Amino acid sequence: GEEVGLTLQKRFRYIREAFSNDELTQIYKLDETKLPRYPLGWEPWLQTALDTIQYQTETEELIFYVGEKAYKEELEARGFEVHLEERRFGISATMIRENPSKYWKYIAQPFRRQFTKKVLIMGSASNGKTTLAKDLARFYDAPVSLEYAREYQIKNNVRDDELTPKDYYYLLLGQYDQTSKLIDSSANRGLVIADTNSLVTKGYYDYYMEVEGQDTSMTDTFDNLFVSILSKEKWDLILFVQPIGSYVNDGFRDMTMADEEIRTSFSNYLDQLR
């Protein structure tokens, strides 16, 4: 798991999540960092495992269920009852890691977020990003996370140039939450496309809040939130769309952005941020 970014802590949390509704199953974490690598170290590994589950030899019965014959032999040699559970689907963890999309239906739901390919389409407004995102999503039969800011502005009836620092906090959190939920949804079959991300929100914040001369404490709060969210966003591919075509007035856009010089300058700033 480590080779694909699945640390011990992630694996532990994801498995706990998978069994969250199972009251009869308990999940433990066994750190093998200081133990000899397999096939060595059976004795210290076994003792660590027994200590971890707080096994009481005099009052409890312990049965191991394993997927490898070698494991069964080693544990039986040490006096434990062992059941060998052979693979029923002809797949392995290695096969999934090498080609997750092929074996997508066999990947437990919490682990799918780790193997999802995430494509970001970013750029300034009114340049065809949304159309491109929808077309790609339709072609690849993938879910798409559209611009949360537009939904937010329609709901609150607020234009680009009327947004406050507090609004931008909500935009950062809302966009990240929307995309994260899509990645974790049943609609995700291994590919998710996003129309925008925190970098674009940061670009607009810098553009409008600098003009309005907001105090530094608000900017510091926003920047801390931005850095935190940006560190969690992992993209496999970023498509940067240049500002080509007419700037459409949809009732919420700031039409000063229709000026070619301003539009190009803002697009260049976004390019620098990424």
Locations of the language-model features?
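Hydrophobic anchor at the beta1->P-loop junction of P-loop NTPases
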Residues: I121
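A glycine- and Lys/Arg-enriched "phosphate-lid" helix/loop adjacent to the NTP-binding pocket
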Residues: Y208-L273
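Conserved glycine(s) of the Walker
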Residues: G128
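Conserved substrate/cofactor phosphate-moiety recognition/catalytic segment
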Residues: R138-S180
